[in-house]
Amino acid sequence: MGRLEVLFLGLTCCLAAACAAKLGAVYTEGGFVEGVNKKLSLLGGDSVDIFKGIPFATAKTLENPQRHPGWQGTLKATNFKKRCLQATITQDNTYGQEDCLYLNIWVPQGRKQVSHNLPVMVWIYGGAFLMGSGQGANFLKNYLYDGEEIATRGNVIVVTFNYRVGPLGFLSTGDANLPGNFGLRDQHMAIAWVKRNIAAFGGDPDNITIFGESAGAASVSLQTLSPYNKGLIRRAISQSGMALSPWAIQKNPLFWAKTIAKKVGCPTEDTGKMAACLKITDPRALTLAYKLPVKKQEYPVVHYLAFIPVIDGDFIPDDPINLYNNTADIDYIAGINNMDGHLFATIDVPAVDKTKQTVTEEDFYRLVSGHTVAKGLKGAQATFDIYTESWAQDPSQENMKKTVVAFETDVLFLIPTEIALAQHKAHAKSAKTYSYLFSHPSRMPIYPKWMGADHADDLQYVFGKPFATPLGYRPQDRAVSKAMIAYWTNFARSGDPNMGNSPVPTHWYPYTLENGNYLDITKTITSASMKEHLREKFLKFWAVTFEVLPTVTGDQDTLTPPEDDSEVAPDPPSDDSQVVPVPPTDDSVEAQMPATIGF
């Protein structure tokens, strides 16, 4: 290389370095923080400022979080912090720590000046309220919830954070002694911190979108319904989960609190004494005192999700169905994956994924019965009949297995999402409502050929993995990812997924009560991807036919839990006798029927 070329290259690099904007140290309510500035090309230019591990709150065991007191000097925010204490996948050990309430920020930067007034997207992770972290799963330091691709492609600020999970996040006695919802309050504290501090990072505190998947999606829904977040949230996106999901609210927290108390040696007759004892118990012992059964359980696995949000009369003041007035001015996108129920079906009916094993009518009826306990034998039979109508014409194992997956998808995700969309639309003032179905098939080679999009399959596309790790993906995967990032970030910017900095493949029309408009997201998105009346027949069955069946009260119509086995997780209660009463209401605020959905 000649001397002139070397001089030119050196000058180019110097100019790039000089022109590249970066934040440096940022002053927050807790003190100064300094992250790292990552260049997006060798010659400089665009970059992203990354801050990892900023504390936003502190919390004692089984108590509400408090604002972080701050620090001296400049905090070097360059590494992710450990996740909140939780059980390992094998449920025989723990990892993480109690000191875990930290957040991470990605800020895209241009060439000449630091970003200003950018939309802010705050991510809430899923994991059954039992596991997870703000950075997500890690493979060779490639973290699932790395916000770089969303931030730089959509020109938005991305924030992720940790919140408490499992017993430490959601254990409740159902009264004031241990009200629960500690994990939800952690989430609220993170959102409130962003509201107070994000302007210093170049964000618009009046344009915050919260988004999440699964338990994170239900959390997003609950945060929009909680009066604590009034004025904090402008928009929301729920991917495969809502506050109305049957696994999102624990109606019998005392049952599970007593179960934990017995295992760790705390009293169970007096909730005050129980709470005092649990608060001084080794947090790891509390965490390991609960195990989610994933084999040979009597009921569908979601019935064993013990430590989840509760109606506490405060943060969640009432049944979520009664709180949709609180979302009247919050724009909303909600949707599901077309085979979201597959993950749960493989636990409840293991033969679904086994090519050499068959699913029987008895298998499916047992599954249906487990999900329709409240309506007794009539509910189980009516549900079984409508879902097996196609079996007479096509009794193949493929059809039967797809029926199992479709049923779990409907019960756990589609029906609650459709009802929530209708509630949001019916109560909207300025708010806009959008619906989608993610149908891009799973890339897992071990799955059957008929498999669609499993639970959580959408995450890799929303977080831009086909671009971050291109060797593992096809061009069609990058097309899906590009479209999702464009729709999501446009929505965060304007409240309309079609309007923003990023072009989209087709116009996404809003949801209506009459037509139930939704965007079908797959490898080719065209005008034909806008569809109506998703699974109308089954939605009508659940919202009308099933709903009007009498709720059983007699033992003859309920499933009887098997005898207790100390080696396995306890069986969920089968009736309402132990359910914690809903806070008293008057006639003006009694439980509402869902908004009418057009059929």
UniProtKB/Swiss-Prot annotation:
Cell compartments where the protein resides: Secreted
One BP annotation, GO: ceramide catabolic process
GO molecular function ontology, one term from the record: sterol ester esterase activity
Record's keyword terms, sorted: Disulfide bond, Glycoprotein, Hydrolase, Lipid degradation, Lipid metabolism, Repeat, Secreted, Serine esterase, Signal
EC id: 3.1.1.13, 3.1.1.3, 3.1.1.6
Catalytic residues (UniProt): S214 (acyl-ester intermediate), D340 (charge relay system), H455 (charge relay system)
Entry comment describing in which tissues the protein is expressed: EXpressed by eosinophils.
Reaction(s) the record says it catalyses: a triacylglycerol + H2O = a diacylglycerol + a fatty acid + H(+); 1,2,3-tri-(9Z-octadecenoyl)-glycerol + H2O = di-(9Z)-octadecenoylglycerol + (9Z)-octadecenoate + H(+); 1,2,3-trioctanoylglycerol + H2O = dioctanoylglycerol + octanoate + H(+); a sterol ester + H2O = a sterol + a fatty acid + H(+)
Signal peptide: 1-20
Presence of keyword Membrane: no
Activity regulation summary: Activated by bile salts such as sodium taurocholate.
Region (4 X 11 AA tandem repeats, O-glycosylated region): 559-588
Disulfide bonds: C84-C100, C266-C277
PANTHER family tied to this protein: NEUROLIGIN
Similarity section: Belongs to the type-B carboxylesterase/lipase family.
Function text: Catalyzes the hydrolysis of a wide range of substrates including cholesteryl esters, phospholipids, lysophospholipids, di- and tri-acylglycerols, and fatty acid esters of hydroxy fatty acids (FAHFAs). Preferentially hydrolyzes FAHFAs with the ester bond further away from the carboxylate. Unsaturated FAHFAs are hydrolyzed more quickly than saturated FAHFAs. Has an essential role in the complete digestion of dietary lipids and their intestinal absorption, along with the absorption of fat-soluble vitamins.
The protein's assembly and partners: Interacts with CLC.
Protein name per Swiss-Prot or TrEMBL: Bile salt-activated lipase
Gene label: Cel
